[in-house]
Amino acid sequence: MGWIRRRTWMAWLGFLLLLAAGVFLVVIVRRQQRSIPMPDESMVELAVEHEGTTYRLVNGDLYRVASPDRLVFVEKLYDKDFREKNYTKQDGQVFRVDTDTGKRYPTRRHLEEGFENADQITELIGAGRGWTAFTLQSSSTPSVPEYVRLRNRILRGESKFVDNRVEPSSEIVHTGTRALKCYSLPPTPKMICAKASLSTELLYFVKGDDVWFSGWYFIPEGGMPFTLMDLETTWVKEHPGMRIMIEDGAAMFELKWATKPKYRQPKASRVRIPVGRWVHLKACFHLSEMPDGRVRLWQDGDKLIDQQGQTLPLAGAIYDSLEIGISAHSFGPNPATVYVDDVAISD
């Protein structure tokens, strides 16, 4: 019986070796299939070097330069056909198409919100007011599936807030009787950031547009949020775009993409964001993937930033998303609270 066991063991060993060899060959073939010849420069959307490695973006796919005449696939950053699949135009109006139902929603190039006539976050969500989602990322819901699941349960009336909150409030208002209150716990050491924000994905801004944003913010004493506003494209991985950040207590811009260009106030005359009172932030972005873009920032009527530089990740990108509130909380161990009121975005 021992020889039978030995023969069986040897047969299994042979099978495993063949299986391993087959897997190895499949991996090699796949790797070969996922490389392409070096394309013409006119087809390259982005060329960037990171930690000694050069990358090229071609038709939405990111490649590593493996040799002077060969690119190796790294990952897909966006679907090159996203525009055709998700947008249609009729009588001059651009519509966003729900690919599951076929329903069309008119995109917006103008949105104003004072948060009046709303007592719950669910009353702000929908095509009528133009907001499409809210994000509650915390230690209780650190991953995307977890906070999406919580959001859906809140929208269905099956759950209440767990810790982070986004809701209309009468506690502190700029005008009227309501403002948006955003409250976020600090992120845990394993999290990049926490969030408590309101967003829409019905915008439509493209290269060449001038996008104006205005909002009133009240930050109480305590934790300071990292970002107050994000203008993003959700069609590209990681949702790159322009954002208003707070660095060393002062407002600044960053294009969250590739080398992350930043636009700061002059150091000698830097004006901090006030705490404990309302402050008005107004911004204008001239959209371009080239250095001829432009950013401007006013705080309480005073122009603090006016610089040229890249403001769009890619020439064909569509800024479809505006996120307001605590779009990122990364500073310190304290919770952060932000009140937002009288928000507007337009061309």
Regions found by a protein language model. Give the residues of each.
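Ser/Thr/Pro/Gly-rich low-complexity linker/stalk segments immediately outside membranes or between
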Residues: 29-47
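Short acidic-hydrophobic surface loop/beta-edge motif
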Residues: 36, 46-50, 56-58, 87-88, ...
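N-terminal Sec-pathway targeting helices
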Residues: 2-18
